[in-house]
Regions:
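Active-site/catalytic core of tyrosine-dependent DNA strand-transfer enzymes
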Residues: 80-85, 129, 138, 148-201, ...
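Hydrophobic (often cysteine-bearing) scaffold residues that line and stabilize catalytic clefts
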Residues: 15, 34-41, 80, 99-100, ...
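C-terminal catalytic core of tyrosine-transesterase DNA break-rejoin enzymes
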Residues: 33, 51, 105-116, 182-186, ...
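C-terminal secondary-structure termini that scaffold catalytic or DNA-interacting sites
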Residues: 139, 151-167, 174-179, 214, ...
Length: 280
């Protein structure tokens, strides 16, 4: 432990009361999550000390019962499928900028994470190849990710190109400052103005749920959402082997979004096509 007087004590002199005292200090500062993290770290340190014969017992054992429980994690509000049309129509009629509207549309059409979306540059976009690539540095798993572009996303990008293209290194969604990109709050505020409690992450949840209900295979959905499984070889296999499946899958999703915004019947999944994709 590094706080309070316990930080200066030899490890053999630290007892349960000393550890609890430090945890109470952290809890009193209003950072309960940090207190739980500190307890976990302390237990690991003391366990190591036991393993090398320095200590006989762990003074941090069972202290988790002395701390209040962590609050339950707040899940990102998911968008229901029947809210997509009203949300998009309200967004289009709102006072949000065309660039912000385009960002939200692409988030819905592609299921990209917030950071991956906001850090995109025009050098990441291949309109002719109907493909968009997110650099490894901008991905949660630090691995480069590519997504097929349905025709709806290509249409959004072509309109956006006229507004924000300043070269391959320029951001798709620039912010107000020099070399800045759009902020998370800008997208969040625009979504709030639609009257729907939803985040870009909630759009990812909708995409996954809906495509699962349509019968598209798990591997294709996991690859599209860039969920990390296995080593780099496994990831390369997932990206390459399921690319044709993802092209079909994401075009179907784009057609669904178009129909919902227009208030028209949602296109049915071609059962035979899905079966072929699942069997491949």
């Amino acid at each position: 432990m590094v706080a309070s007087a316990a930080g200066a004590l030899p490890i053999k002199a630290i007892d349960t009361v000393s550890v609890l005292s430090v945890l109470r200090e952290i809890e009193a500062a209003g950072v309960l999550h940090t207190a739980h993290q500190a307890l976990t770290t302390a237990r690991m340190i003391f366990d190591f000390a036991i393993s090398i014969g320095v200590l006989q017992f762990n003074p941090a054992d069972r202290l988790h019962k002395a701390l209040p429980r962590r609050p339950k994690a707040q899940h990102h509000p998911a968008l229901a499928i029947d809210q997509v049309g009203p949300m998009l129509r309200t967004l289009e009629a709102s006072g949000s900028s065309p660039v912000t509207k385009a960002a939200i549309r692409l988030a819905l059409l592609l299921g990209l994470r917030d950071t991956s979306l906001r850090t995109l540059t025009w050098g990441d976009v291949d309109l002719a190849g109907a493909q968009l690539t997110v650099r490894a540095a901008n991905m949660k798993g630090r691995r480069e990710f590519s997504t097929p572009l349905p025709k709806q996303a290509i249409a959004v990008l072509k309109e956006l190109h006229a507004l924000t293209f300043r070269g391959p290194d320029s951001y798709l969604f620039p912010g107000s400052g020099k070399n800045a990109r759009v902020s998370p709050s800008t997208l969040g505020d625009a979504l709030k103005r639609t009257g729907h409690t939803v985040t870009t992450h909630g759009m990812r949840s909708l995409l996954n749920t809906y495509l699962a209900e349509c019968g598209f295979r798990l591997e294709a959905r996991e690859a599209q959402l860039a969920h990390v499984h296995g080593d780099q070889t496994d990831q390369a296999y997932m990206r390459s082997n399921f690319w044709p499946h993802r092209v079909e899958m994401m075009q179907h999703w784009g057609d669904v979004v178009t129909a919902l915004e227009a208030g028209k019947p949602v296109p049915r999944v071609e059962v035979d096509k899905v079966r072929r994709i699942r069997a491949a």
